[in-house]
Design a protein with these regions (language model features):
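Transmembrane alpha-helices
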Residues: 13-14, 19-26, 135, 142, ...
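Transmembrane alpha-helix signature in integral membrane proteins
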Residues: 59-90
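Short hydrophobic faces within alpha-helices
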Residues: 65, 90, 107, 162-170, ...
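N-terminal, non-cleaved signal-anchor transmembrane helix
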Residues: 1-59, 63-66, 70
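Interhelical loop and adjacent transmembrane-helix boundary motif
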Residues: 2-7, 37-39, 52-60, 202-241
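Cytoplasmic-entry segments and transmembrane alpha-helices of multi-pass inner-membrane transporters
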Residues: 4, 8-15, 85-119, 164
C-alpha cells in the first residue's frame, strides 16, 4: 500500500514537472509582455499595455490574422473531407495496391518541412499560383490531411461492420447509408479532425514562410517582427494570437467591414 502511494506521488510530481516545463516559457512570455522596458529585465519595469496597443493598432497584424483564419478554416474543411474519404476507403474496400495507397496517404508528415516547402514552392511557381492564399491552403491541406485520416480511421475501426450492412438490407443505398450511419458514427472524430487540422494550419510556419508571398500569416509576421530585434510587442502578439478564438476574429473582421 505504501509502495503504491509512493509511486502515485512520484507520478504526480513527474507530471507536474512536465507541465511546468511546457508552460513556464509561455507564462514568462506573458509576464514580460507587460514590462515597460524594451528588453526583458529582472526586476521588471513599470506595468504597461502599450505593446498590446501597438499590436491592436497594427493593420499588418490584423491582415495576417485574417489570412491565418481564412487559411486554417479552409484547410480544416478540405483536410477533414480528404481524411474522411481516405479513411472510409481504407475501411470499406480491399484492393491489391492498398499498402501503397496508405503509404502515399500517410507520407507527408514524414517528410521534413523544409524539403516539402521547397517542393511546394517549385510546384506552385510552375503552376503560376505561387504567393497566393490558395497555395497556402493547398500546402497545408496536404500536410494535415493524414492527421484527419488517422483520427477518423481509428473511429471507423470501432464501428460494427454489420451496421452499414443492416442499412443496406433495409433499403438504403450507399449514399443514404453513408449519411445516416457512417457520418453520425464518425461525428466526434470529424469534429476532432477539424479542430486539430485548423490548429496545425494556424500555427504552421515553415511551409507558410516559403509559399505565402505577400499573404503573411501570424507565424510569418511574428518572425518578421522578431528578426533583428527583441521587442515586447512580439511577446504580446504571441499571447494575443493564443487567445484569439475564431469567434473573436470573425466579429472583429465583420466590424471592420
Amino acid at each position: 500500500m505504501t509502495d503504491n502511494r509512493t509511486l502515485r506521488w512520484f507520478l504526480f510530481a513527474y507530471l507536474a514537472l512536465v507541465f511546468v516545463f511546457i508552460f513556464a516559457p509561455i507564462f514568462f512570455s506573458v509576464v514580460f509582455s507587460f514590462n515597460s522596458d524594451r528588453f526583458p529585465t529582472i526586476p521588471l519595469g513599470n506595468f504597461t499595455l502599450k505593446w498590446y496597443q501597438t499590436v491592436w493598432n497594427d493593420p499588418d497584424v490584423w491582415e495576417a490574422a485574417r489570412t491565418s483564419l481564412t487559411v486554417s478554416l479552409s484547410t480544416a474543411t478540405i483536410a477533414t473531407a480528404l481524411g474522411f474519404a481516405t479513411a472510409y476507403t481504407d475501411y470499406r474496400y480491399s484492393f491489391r495496391l492498398k499498402p501503397i495507397y496508405l503509404g502515399l496517404v500517410l507520407l507527408p508528415p514524414t517528410i521534413p518541412l523544409i524539403i516539402m516547402a521547397l517542393a511546394m514552392l517549385a510546384w506552385f511557381a510552375k503552376l503560376g499560383i505561387s504567393g497566393q492564399v490558395m497555395s497556402i491552403i493547398i500546402a497545408h491541406s496536404v500536410l494535415t490531411a493524414p492527421f484527419a485520416m488517422a483520427i477518423i480511421r481509428l473511429r471507423l475501426s470501432q464501428m460494427d461492420p454489420s451496421l452499414e450492412a443492416a442499412a443496406w438490407n433495409l433499403g438504403a443505398n450507399e449514399w443514404s447509408a453513408m449519411r445516416r450511419v457512417i457520418v453520425p458514427f464518425c461525428r466526434p472524430a470529424i469534429i476532432s479532425s477539424f479542430c486539430l487540422t485548423a490548429a496545425v494550419s494556424f500555427d504552421e510556419f515553415a511551409i507558410s514562410w516559403f509559399v505565402s508571398g505577400l499573404n503573411k500569416t501570424i507565424p510569418v509576421i511574428i518572425l518578421e517582427i522578431v528578426t533583428g530585434n527583441i521587442d515586447p510587442q512580439v511577446r504580446s502578439e504571441e499571447h494575443t494570437s493564443e487567445l484569439q478564438s475564431p469567434d473573436h476574429l470573425v466579429c472583429r473582421l465583420l466590424l471592420e467591414k
